[in-house]
């Protein structure tokens, strides 16, 4: 054996700072809420909270499906075709990541104004803008990982391009596409900035957390935060696990 | 049956130039060339996967250049076999049949039939990644043959297999050909495959098809120095083997192993030694030969020898040429060890 690899220990020590930094607030908020159980029970029975949670889950799910519906075909084109301006299209897809989300809200409102103002459409519009890149890029990576020769063989055996897509490319890229859908869903659930500007109503849980904090303070906003996190995390973890099993 | 007319194509680093040849019904046509010569691109143009910049492809006189792959009824087996990893072996083989709207019972029967012929009927429920290389290749061939294609397009079908599996599959390929009666275009860099399976061969070098013809003719009479250098094996003899003896005209050549029937053997020019008088050694093939040509290659000299009608080329050093005093038209003895003979199965 060689001597101890101190460099790796050093890196591990530095790296664990970030892991602890992410885990610590999550554990803390759950722990503190556990001590204040009464408030949690009260919140669970608050119809306003339940309504907001329902709104969040519905809009995020709708957004994930819409981003897949449009993102999967786009991902396929990006994976399979070379065309002029492809780099430009790829850059546009990544733009939402760099725009501050409040600015996204302003842009959407300037562009679509009353059509999306304070409506479910508005929530979904805001979510779609910030989450679509996840769906598109995962779909593209999924299709890139499918050997093009498989499609060629399917074609020579008599399958049209569309038939080949549905019987070969799509099933093989499905785990990657699904994980893109989950990321889009998770990104939608965590969106606040753009929704705040475009559609304060109908009220979503993310917005409600902020409203309770502004109006009633930390103690009132904490239980909703915990519930929102519990739901998001468990769905996220469950879906990831499901994909992992399918991949096996 | 298939006519390829002046196909040209620039594709990535490959440049195909003015490629023309034709394939006859029931023929096993080999496209032989080193890697990077553009063989795969040519095959994919014929399959309809890549469209050519110029030129036409005719199937029984009908122009199919613009047809998509699914309308050509050619089966394509890429070098990596491209088995569908998410389907069982059964579903892989059944893929083309299902697309042809054949009733399910009929599909199952046909799959079983072809799987039996190829010796893979015990693997039908398995997923491709659990199979060995040789088994995967059989599945790919079964999937291609079951749809009764007009043309079977094979890209380096044996390149990824170990030597034993390879020679076994080559032998079986001949049997399957009799059984299914397919016409094939087979792309390879292996002389062994060309000589064992090919009826005719096209030599492809740097994007051009430089010589097309009968396998034996191309190997024995390369049209250009380029082809000759690529083929390396200059002495290809065809004869009828009976155990360890190969009969070629009046000659009896001792072989390194037992073979029966029509075979081709190759001897490298550097493996032939020249004597002025016949020496009797049991382990050697010794034949009287007439020197028909002497070609100076620098340190080496290439002799063209006539062994009772069979032309062999031999390399000797310049000093032994002088020592032996060999001149054109003279009678010498050519000898080569049985172990220096390469038998093409």
Swiss-Prot record, chain A:
Every copy of the ABC transmembrane type-1 domain together lies at 53-239
Q: Name one GO biological process term.
A: transmembrane transport
Location (main, coarse): membrane
Under InterPro entries, the record lists: MetI-like, MetI-like_sf, Mo/W_ABC_Transporter_Permease
Per the record, ranges on the Extracellular side are 31-56, 113-115, 186-223
Q: Give residue spans on the Cytoplasmic membrane side.
A: 1-9, 78-91, 137-164, 245-248
GO cellular component terms given for this protein: plasma membrane
**Which Pfam families does its entry note?**
BPD_transp_1
What family is this protein classified in? Answer: Belongs to the binding-protein-dependent transport system permease family.
**Function description:** Part of the ABC transporter complex WtpABC involved in molybdate/tungstate import. Probably responsible for the translocation of the substrate across the membrane.
Share what the entry says about its subunit structure, partners included: The complex is composed of two ATP-binding proteins (WtpC), two transmembrane proteins (WtpB) and a solute-binding protein (WtpA).
Protein name as it appears in the record: Molybdate/tungstate transport system permease protein WtpB
Which organism was this protein described from? Pyrococcus horikoshii (strain ATCC 700860 / DSM 12428 / JCM 9974 / NBRC 100139 / OT-3)
UniProtKB/Swiss-Prot annotation, chain B:
Name residues in a coiled coil: none
Query: How is the protein disposed in the membrane?
Result: Peripheral membrane protein
Single GO cellular component term: plasma membrane
Name the InterPro entries for this protein. AAA+_ATPase (IPR003593), ABC_SmlMolc_Importer (IPR050093), ABC_transporter-like_ATP-bd (IPR003439), ABC_transporter-like_CS (IPR017871), Mo/tungstate-bd_C_term_dom (IPR008995), Molybdate/tungstate_ABC-ATPase (IPR053428), Mop_domain (IPR004606), P-loop_NTPase (IPR027417)
Domain (ABC transporter) spans 2-231
**Listed PROSITE patterns:** ABC_TRANSPORTER_1, ABC_TRANSPORTER_2, MOP
The family this protein is said to belong to: Belongs to the ABC transporter superfamily. Sulfate/tungstate importer (TC 3.A.1.6) family.
State the function annotated in the UniProt record: Part of the ABC transporter complex WtpABC involved in molybdate/tungstate import. Responsible for energy coupling to the transport system.
The entry's protein name is: Molybdate/tungstate import ATP-binding protein WtpC
Which organism encodes this protein? Pyrococcus horikoshii (strain ATCC 700860 / DSM 12428 / JCM 9974 / NBRC 100139 / OT-3)
């Amino acid at each position: 054996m060689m001597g101890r690899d101190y460099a790796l220990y050093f890196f591990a020590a530095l790296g664990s700072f970030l892991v602890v930094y992410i885990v610590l607030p999550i554990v803390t908020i759950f722990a503190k809420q556990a001590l204040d159980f009464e408030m949690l029970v009260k919140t669970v029975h608050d119809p306003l909270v339940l309504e907001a949670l329902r709104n969040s889950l519905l809009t995020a799910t709708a957004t994930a499906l819409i981003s897949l519906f449009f993102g999967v075909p786009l991902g396929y084109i990006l994976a399979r075709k070379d065309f002029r301006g492809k780099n430009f299209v790829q850059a546009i897809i990544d733009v939402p990541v760099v725009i501050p989300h409040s600015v996204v809200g302003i842009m959407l409102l300037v562009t679509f104004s009353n059509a999306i103002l304070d409506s479910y459409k508005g929530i979904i519009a805001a979510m779609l803008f910030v989450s679509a890149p996840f769906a598109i890029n995962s779909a593209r990576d999924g299709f890139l990982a499918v050997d093009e020769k498989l499609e060629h063989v399917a074609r020579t055996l008599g399958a049209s391009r569309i038939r080949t897509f549905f019987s070969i490319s799509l099933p093989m890229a499905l785990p990657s596409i699904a994980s893109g859908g989950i990321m889009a869903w998770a990104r939608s659930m965590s969106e606040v900035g753009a929704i705040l500007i475009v559609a304060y109503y109908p009220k979503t849980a993310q917005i409600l957390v902020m409203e309770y904090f502004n109006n009633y303070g930390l103690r009132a906003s904490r239980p909703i935060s915990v519930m929102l996190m519990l739901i998001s995390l468990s769905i996220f973890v469950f879906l990831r696990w499901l994909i992992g099993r399918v991949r096996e | 049956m298939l006519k390829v007319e002046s196909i040209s194509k620039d594709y990535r680093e490959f440049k195909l130039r003015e490629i023309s040849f034709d394939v006859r019904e029931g023929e096993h046509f080999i496209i032989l060339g080193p890697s990077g010569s553009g063989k795969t691109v040519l095959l994919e143009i014929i399959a309809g996967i890549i469209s050519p910049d110029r030129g036409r492809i005719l199937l029984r006189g009908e122009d199919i250049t613009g047809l998509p792959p699914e309308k050509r009824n050619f089966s394509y087996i890429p070098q990596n076999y491209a088995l569908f990893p998410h389907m069982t072996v059964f579903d892989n083989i059944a893929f083309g049949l299902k697309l042809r709207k054949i009733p399910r019972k009929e599909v199952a029967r046909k799959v079983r039939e072809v799987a039996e012929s190829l010796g893979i009927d015990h693997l039908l429920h398995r997923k491709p990644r659990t199979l060995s290389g040789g088994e995967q290749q059989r599945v790919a061939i079964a999937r291609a043959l079951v749809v009764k294609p007009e043309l079977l397009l094979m890209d380096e079908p044996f390149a990824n297999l170990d030597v034993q599996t390879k020679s076994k599959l080559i032998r079986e390929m001949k049997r399957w050909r009799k059984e299914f009666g397919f016409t094939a275009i087979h792309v390879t860099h292996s002389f062994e495959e060309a000589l064992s399976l090919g009826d005719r061969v096209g030599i492809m070098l740097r994007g051009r098809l430089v010589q097309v013809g009968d396998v034996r003719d191309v190997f024995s009479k390369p049209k250009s120095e380029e082809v000759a250098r690529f083929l390396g094996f200059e002495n290809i003899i065809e004869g009828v083997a009976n155990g360890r003896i190969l009969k070629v005209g009046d000659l009896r050549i001792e072989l390194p192993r037992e073979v029966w029937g029509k075979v081709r053997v190759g001897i490298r020019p550097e493996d032939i030694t020249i004597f002025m008088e016949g020496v009797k050694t049991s382990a050697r093939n010794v034949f009287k030969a007439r020197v028909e040509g002497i070609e100076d290659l620098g340190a080496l000299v290439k002799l063209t020898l006539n062994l009772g009608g069979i032309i062999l080329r031999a390399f000797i050093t310049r000093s032994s040429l002088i020592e032996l005093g060999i001149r054109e038209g003279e009678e010498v003895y050519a000898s080569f060890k049985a172990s220096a003979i390469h038998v093409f199965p």
